[in-house]
Amino acid sequence: MINLRKTHPLLKIINQSFIDLPAPSNISAWWNFGSLLGICLIIQILTGLFLAMHYTSDTLTAFSSVAHICRDVNHGWLLRNLHANGASMFFMCLFLHVGRGIYYGSYLYKETWNIGVILLLTVMAMAFVGYVLPWGQMSFWGATVITNLLSAIPYIGTTLAEWIWGGFAVDKATLTRFFAFHFILPFIVTALALVHLLFLHETGSNNPSGINPDSDKIPFHPYYTIKDALGLMLLFLVLLLLALFSPDLLGDPDNFSPANPLNTPPHIKPEWYFLFAYAILRSIPNKLGGVLALLASILILLIIPLLHTANQRSMMFRPISQTLFWILTANLITLTWIGGQPVEQPFIIIGQLAPMLYFLLILVLMPLAGLFENYMLKPKW
């Protein structure tokens, strides 16, 4: 009798995606992050579902309901800490996943890459509306500052901002709709992730060498299921260390105070995973210019496939491009640091130079490095 997993209409899809999938024999641990992101999404949906059972999206009770979850609900503190720190793990995996894609030229699978960028934007939106829900000081003022950016859009900006708010400022209507958005977005992300996987399986996985791996494929199970399981254990280890030993390490102390529209915190800043974009936003002393730079800093990922000039796909054998890639990584870490600093010297000048270098590296230096490496590879005799 032929195996059920190969004939059953549903099991067949799972089999072709996770069991008998032909995978390159040389993919490294950098290829673990796709499965880790899937697990992060499942953790977030499950913990979020149980939190939503006890949370109330009303300005008068939202803050108290979060305190109630932590104090009175069975293991509520654990659910909340796993959900909050799970978001940090999610973004850590996301950034590493995108970095892997840039380093090894995975962006040349254009459909997969473009869906990935849409996924990144959707997850960022999801995290932003989620951060507003506890209705602490930083939740409220973060929502006020970021939604206010819409008013920079010429002509329709103010109307658009008021439409999002459901009034003339961030208030009860805003909180209620943000809860609705935060509930629906994970399911949209799940659907997009399936499309992402669908496009990936049309072409098959890339590999560190960037060379076509068709001549040397191995089944996904057991080789990569066991490899992913190791990554999963490490992810759980870091998540549990964070959630159990220092759950507030990555949070903002201001969010322990209930939202107060009459009292602005001294330093308004988002969670660590948005700080790089926030630094780029703040670097331009013009509202519309800052908003455009903020959008460009993420949407620039969409044009990376068009900027690929090298004859080789991967950076594995391209030392000049490698150097520029690691400068870009250091630059993003610098931007993250600057985004969390007050607006004063020397942070202002660093915060203006770093975004310039960011765009210069991606738009000019890396394409030029690719062309130069092509020239260096040509025989000179």
UniProtKB/Swiss-Prot annotation:
List residues binding heme b b566: H97, H196
The listed locations are: Mitochondrion inner membrane
Query: What membrane topology was assigned to this protein in its record?
Result: Multi-pass membrane protein
Q: Which UniProt keywords apply?
A: Electron transport, Heme, Iron, Membrane, Metal-binding, Mitochondrion, Mitochondrion inner membrane, Respiratory chain, Transmembrane, Transmembrane helix, Transport, Ubiquinone
Query: What are the transmembrane regions?
Result: 33-53, 77-98, 113-133, 178-198, 226-246, 288-308, 320-340, 347-367
Q: Name one GO biological process term.
A: mitochondrial electron transport, ubiquinol to cytochrome c
Classification via InterPro entries: Cyt_b/b6_C (IPR005798), Cyt_b/b6_C_sf (IPR036150), Cyt_b/b6_N (IPR005797), Cytb/b6-like_sf (IPR027387), Cytochrome_b (IPR030689), Cytochrome_b_C_euk/bac (IPR048260), Cytochrome_b_N_euk/bac (IPR048259), Di-haem_cyt_TM (IPR016174)
Superkingdom of origin organism: Eukaryota
Q: Which GO terms describe its cellular component?
A: mitochondrial inner membrane; respiratory chain complex III
Which cofactors, if any, are listed as required? heme b
**Co-factor note (free text):** Binds 2 heme b groups non-covalently.
Q: Where does a ubiquinone bind?
A: H201
The residues the record assigns to binding heme b b562 are: H83, H182
Molecular function, one GO term: ubiquinol-cytochrome-c reductase activity
Subunit structure of this chain's protein = The cytochrome bc1 complex contains 11 subunits: 3 respiratory subunits (MT-CYB, CYC1 and UQCRFS1), 2 core proteins (UQCRC1 and UQCRC2) and 6 low-molecular weight proteins (UQCRH/QCR6, UQCRB/QCR7, UQCRQ/QCR8, UQCR10/QCR9, UQCR11/QCR10 and a cleavage product of UQCRFS1). This cytochrome bc1 complex then forms a dimer.
Per the entry, what this protein does is: Component of the ubiquinol-cytochrome c reductase complex (complex III or cytochrome b-c1 complex) that is part of the mitochondrial respiratory chain. The b-c1 complex mediates electron transfer from ubiquinol to cytochrome c. Contributes to the generation of a proton gradient across the mitochondrial membrane that is then used for ATP synthesis.
Question: What more does the entry say?
Answer: Heme 1 (or BL or b562) is low-potential and absorbs at about 562 nm, and heme 2 (or BH or b566) is high-potential and absorbs at about 566 nm.
What's this protein's family per the entry? Belongs to the cytochrome b family.
Protein's name in the database: Cytochrome b
Gene encoding it? Answer: MT-CYB
